[in-house]
Amino acid sequence: DIDSAVEGVVDAIWFNQGQVCCAGSRLLVQEGIADVFYTKLKARMSGLRIGDPLDKCIDIGAIVHPRQQARIRDMLAAHPEGETFQTTAPGGCYFPPTLITGLAPASPLMQQEIFGPVLVATTFRTPVEAVEIANSTRYGLAASVWSENINLALDVAPKLVAGIVWVNGTNMMDAAAGFGGVRESGFGREGGWEGLTGYTKPVAAPAKTRSIAAHTGDGGAGGLDRTAKLYIGGKQARPDSGYSRAVYGPKGALLGHTSLASRKDLRNAVEACNAAKGWAKSSGHLRAQILYYMAENLSARATEFATRLKSLTGSDGTAEVEASISRLFSAAAWADKYDGQVHDVPIRGVALAMKEPVGTIGILCPDDAPLLGLISAMAPAIAMGNRVILAASQPFPLIATDLYQVLDTSDLPGGVVNILTGDHSDLADPMARHMDIDAVWSFADPALAKGIEVAAAGNLKRTWCGALDWSRDNTKAILPHATEVKNIWIPYGA
């Protein structure tokens, strides 16, 4: 029904003169119907009435400010691309409804937010191409999918990187269903349980982060002198800088050396995460089985890890290893059970609240509980389908490097878990600024928190800076930080 789709487009872009955050300012039309669709859309545009917004017979009012009117005009003048169709508008702070067709997906007008009554359009041939073009943007607030084939619409909707997707509709809101975006459209939700939980606080008093200084010493190595490498893309890799640091035990004995990761190593880890995006598409059951297998492999080497913890910290590590195994089992159990909801909304239809992985998460692991803290943060994140870059405990990094072989033998795809060792202060800022890292969690030195949040503001990255009581099972509390909620509005019936 092309006519209904045309009405939907008119409502999406020219509601409030296109000056709304969820305006449907980019139009993707199937190539076979593009000419017919554009003709009908232009005819509908010609009938739009422009004038005093207090007149109930008026469709389009004035632009919010003359500066915004000038900005829209300047943007169009700076990029005279495609074919422009424009209706007339009265004098004053008005801008005529505008349609620009024939644009390339990389055109600045397709990539930048115009925030006005301007609709830019391009065509696609297949649904796969449509999804690629739709997701080729910095923003991700809302999208509309129009199709008579509901199966096709339900195939496309979950693939769109947006916080809310309307099927055969637009601009539908309700307090029962969350509204919010991803990428540079921001984070957080209004409405729904996910919107409410954003304003809640834990009942228990928050834990305090402990910053622990590394042990020093001048003793020689007791056995073979080893330098642990980084773990990137399922392989051990030498640091780009070539630098390493000695790690000493509490009595000054040299336990080994660890690599010092740099910005370049972080970039390599991000590339490995990008190559492992298929992990998000795997079933919760498969992710659970891999986590169970990881727990079994760690259990088989429990004595070895407990001994390593004692040599690093001076304390018995048996309880920490047992708790780490328990956290893996807990995350595995949640992998296929932390599911979404079906909301009753005021249309003849439903809104599906789907839990989706955040993407790539950078995690600064706590100094204390070097094994338990790492696994407690890592396991829920990968259980939800995320890829992670872990900056190991700064004073006790060797326990993380011992984990490489457990990961290698647990059927975990390369790139899902990447482990860096080195100074958290060297890795925190690049993590927060990197455009391909979707969230940063910091359980390390609290002095790093402010810098992380300031650096992440440039790309609206989700941040979580705080402390947890690692002796408790925090898996359920971590899961909301590891997921985004996408609401898909689906009509049914006549």
Task: Locate each region found by the language model.
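ALDH superfamily catalytic-core signature
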Residues: D1-A104, I133, V167, S211-A213, ...
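Short, well-ordered beta-strand elements within core beta-sheets of diverse protein domains
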Residues: R26-E31, I60-R71, T98-T101, I114-T126, ...
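Extended, hydrophobic interaction surfaces within ordered domains
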Residues: T39, A70-R73, N151-L152, V156-H215, ...
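Short acidic-hydrophobic, aromatic-tinged amphipathic segments that line or gate anion-handling sites
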Residues: A121-R125, N418-D423
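Short acidic active-site motifs
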Residues: E129, G349, D426-L427
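Glycine-rich loop-to-alpha-helix module at the N-terminal edge of alpha/beta enzyme cores
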Residues: N151, G252-Y338
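Hydrophobic face of amphipathic alpha-helices that form TPR/SEL1-like repeat modules
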Residues: Y199-L255, K337
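Conserved small-residue-rich beta-alpha loop and adjacent elements
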Residues: Y243, P250, A333, K337-P413
